[in-house]
């Protein structure tokens, strides 16, 4: 398991050690978000957490709240829900749903500055964490 996911799992557990914790994983490519969320879920499981997974293809916030978030929050037991999907998962109105958020990207995709962590996934087997250093933006950002 890549150290990047272990480190992010450790960070989540340091910040939110118990209770019902919600993690959103999003990016331009929703399928890549699914893989990233699966890998993060595996790291959280390896760290001794009970993990639940959900994925949304369209990021419909109302459906996500009604069908996934509200039922999860109804039971406050110690576990982590990792939800993956398109950029809408971390939209301005949806950001408050998550205790922690991950924006995955590849190539010159633009970073999402409101995410808790940015993970570069040019090679999903070798992810690495990026930090929002706006002095070093990719060319596609217009820098």
Protein language model regions, located:
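C-terminal functional extensions of proteins
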Residues: 110-143
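Short beta-strand-centered segment that lines the nucleotide-binding/catalytic pocket of NTP-utilizing
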Residues: 41-60
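Hydrophobic/aromatic beta-strand patches that form the interior of the parallel beta-sheet core
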Residues: 23, 52-54, 99-104, 116-120
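Conserved nucleotide-cofactor-binding alpha/beta core module
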Residues: 59-70
